[in-house]
Amino acid sequence: MTKLVTWHIKNAKILDVFNLKFDDTELWINDNQILYRGKRSDLTAENTFDAGGGYIVPGLIDSHLHIESSLLTPSEFGKLVIPHGITRIFADPHEIASVAGVSGIQYMLEDAKQTPLNIHYMLPSSVPATPFEHAGATLHADALKPFYSVPEVNGLAEVMDFPAVANLDPDMLQKIKDAEDAGRHVDGHAAGLTPEQLAVYRNVGIDTDHESENAKEALERLNAGFSIFVREGTVERDEKAILPAITMANQSHFSFATDDKTANDIQSEGSIDYSVKLAIENGMDPAIAFTIATYNAAQAHKLQNIGALTDGFVADLAVFDDLAHLETPKVMIGGHWYKDNQSIVTPLANQSLNFSLTKSDIALPLQSDKPAHIINITPHHITTEHTVEEVPVEQGLFVANETFAKIVVAERYHNLGHGVGIIKGFNMRDGAIASTIAHDSHNVIIAGVNDDDMILAADTLHEIGGGQVVVNHGKITTLPLPIGGLMSDQPFENVIKTNQQLLQAFSEISDVPFDPFLTLSFMALPVIPSLKITDQGLFDFEKFDFITVQD
């Protein structure tokens, strides 16, 4: 007797993630599930798809990211990444939670219902990230626990407050326990940690990390028992340095992540498909690269029947014509071929900017006979170098120039104050840039060499309700982000176009080869080495305390 199924896929080279090879075989799909891999004479399909000799892989999975870094809502983000073969992501809504607390998480969950992209949320573990900055909300364990009743919540996101774990902070330990009690798992954030410190994380149950910047760090995490998310984002370009650590013997412990990637970069180079392409270009067997991007990611996140193309697995897949270019795959999610979906953007209520800055506020008194502590940008990385250098001082005040810019972080929720410092690496000849995206508390952050333009940039953020600004001698270019000062209410095509205009405006005052806004956003993140700035001042990661600009 013949059984009727939904789809028969034939004439394809289909990835076998268990034996790390492509087979000339077939798939039989019924509703959202793969019924059988191989030839069957007793099955009949309502629909047949001839792959034309193309390559079929499981839907690609992003192991760790922040949707907000794309400046898009979850539903709009889905429209951007699904055409790249992405069918599932693990998102930490830390950014919007830092601004709007529980209501921010609820907003992300609700908006995600408008996209066929499978979005698993990891609950933000550290809001605020440390006690060294003011955020728009504080989330304790009791605020997060109810979310574990939501199927789309997969665990606790990157635990980044190492001192809280090491000192057995009761609230942090409760957050970890609540995740484990709910049958979920806990992601790590182990930037700059020693092997001894990694052991502290592992011993409380943290089992993944995405902060490796090179092969040595990746192997340290592997030896400690972590699953490693190989990061390749807009600023965090770590993959090439990590690839030498991956072998046939250990590949099952690696998956890919973008962490923070702009919509512009996703459209132009790709998402996880770019990570796969980069791995293949650097000598990795395509079967291994795609397995890392699919099955390994599902396993790291404790998902069953996800990430493989065989009997009983969910029918998420991508069809590529060849493995050399990985261009515009045909994508199936849950047994349905993807077509562009419609969505409606809703506002996030009760979000406004509450800060004030004047030129006298951002003046930086210094002694001309003393060196100053400098935040030194590391291009394409979110870490910085802490240097001590002579800087220009006139009449007792720091004077910014193309080498040394001024950087300011202003608390934007309750007008509690601001920090002022010096940053090297933006190479601005004039003007200023400003943003309401400043990890992780998302206060107002401004960098510039012209105080008038810096204040104008701050005032402009007020006027547009949050976003990103370039000011050049009074000429203003903006990208409004009305949803929490983090996300646009526009289609991704419009956001990309406006972002390109913003970058063009910045190119008129600087020639740096990296994304200035994403780089700027991480200059306020004190849990990443080495020297950062918050609304409370300069923060030394090694001392894990504040320091003054001059000793």
Curated annotation (Swiss-Prot):
Domain of life of the source: Bacteria
Disulfide linkage: none
Cofactor: Mn(2+)
Chain coiled-coil ranges: none
A Pfam family of this chain: Amidohydro_1
GO molecular function, one term: adenine deaminase activity
EC nos: 3.5.4.2
Broad enzyme group: hydrolase
GO biological process: adenine catabolic process
Keyword line: Hydrolase, Manganese
Catalytic activity: adenine + H2O + H(+) = hypoxanthine + NH4(+)
Family per similarity comment: Belongs to the metallo-dependent hydrolases superfamily. Adenine deaminase family.
Protein name, entry field: Adenine deaminase
Native species: Leuconostoc mesenteroides subsp. mesenteroides (strain ATCC 8293 / DSM 20343 / BCRC 11652 / CCM 1803 / JCM 6124 / NCDO 523 / NBRC 100496 / NCIMB 8023 / NCTC 12954 / NRRL B-1118 / 37Y)
Gene that specifies this protein: ade
